[in-house]
Amino acid sequence: MPEGVAFPKEIKSFVRRAGRTTTGQAKALEDMGPQFLLPYQTSAIDFIATYADSTGARGNNDINPGPVILEIGFGMGEATAHIAALMPEKNFLCCEVHEPGVGALLKRIGEQGLRNIRIVAHDAVEVIDHMLPLQSLDGVHIFFPDPWHKKKHNKRRLIQSALIAKLAARLKVGGYIHCATDWQPYAEQILEVLSKEPLLKNTATQTHPELAGYAPKPYYRPLTKFENRGIKLGHGVWDIVFERV
């Protein structure tokens, strides 16, 4: 693992899930970490240097590194790797605090030969606050964040107005936030929070009025094993997509 990279021990909007890092994940952390893991820092990230060898880079002499998508909480990286392979022209900055998940995504990166992913194993809120300049992102993905089912824990949900305001300010005009959840009360909260952010507009309002503010599943988001299992059990999934104005 690169010097300066450490998995946070404080519980904030997340909880560290129990789970053992497998031998394969540990090997990926050791072998792939130096190239694809970024240490948390309190200064703005240099996207040009970070993605210089990425498939999303637009040439060594071009100051534009290509579109950058932030992903918050990628789990075991199944959807992340799928989307990065589907969109080689885009660069992905992915935040996750679960060490086995980070190892799993690094393993996928190696197996699939992906070059357009970088990972910060740190609390995403602090990454947003300190590493991401204003109007620097082309998109944000937040798929299946912890719903904190109990009412007394709702305040710990990731998607709150303060976070969305920070993300909206860091999106370029025309950039988007895409959230997905399989917990209807959380979907309703997400839709309400994003609707109140003045820098965002709902992409589904005019195109799909029959969905009451929710969006059809975008083509790039795959059905994961977890999601497929839920669908077979009759669980719903809600996609919410808003655009920066």
UniProtKB/Swiss-Prot annotation:
PANTHER family associated with the record: 3-DEOXY-D-MANNO-OCTULOSONIC-ACID TRANSFERASE/TRNA GUANINE-N 7 - -METHYLTRANSFERASE, PENTACOTRIPEPTIDE-REPEAT REGION OF PRORP DOMAIN-CONTAINING PROTEIN
Organism: Albidiferax ferrireducens (strain ATCC BAA-621 / DSM 15236 / T118)
Name listed for the protein in its UniProt record: tRNA (guanine-N(7)-)-methyltransferase
Similarity field: Belongs to the class I-like SAM-binding methyltransferase superfamily. TrmB family.
Presence of the UniProt keyword Transferase in the record: yes
Residues forming the catalytic site: 146
The protein's Enzyme Commission number: 2.1.1.33
Function, as annotated: Catalyzes the formation of N(7)-methylguanine at position 46 (m7G46) in tRNA.
Catalyzed reactions per annotation: guanosine(46) in tRNA + S-adenosyl-L-methionine = N(7)-methylguanosine(46) in tRNA + S-adenosyl-L-homocysteine
Keywords: Methyltransferase, S-adenosyl-L-methionine, Transferase, tRNA processing
Pfam families: Methyltransf_4
UniProt xrefs under InterPro entries: SAM-dependent_MTases_sf (IPR029063), tRNA_(Gua-N-7)_MeTrfase_Trmb (IPR003358), tRNA_methyltr_TrmB_bact (IPR055361)
Highest taxon of the lineage: Bacteria
Interaction with RNA: annotated span: 152-157
GO cellular component: tRNA methyltransferase complex
GO molecular function: tRNA (guanine(46)-N7)-methyltransferase activity
Chain's gene name: trmB
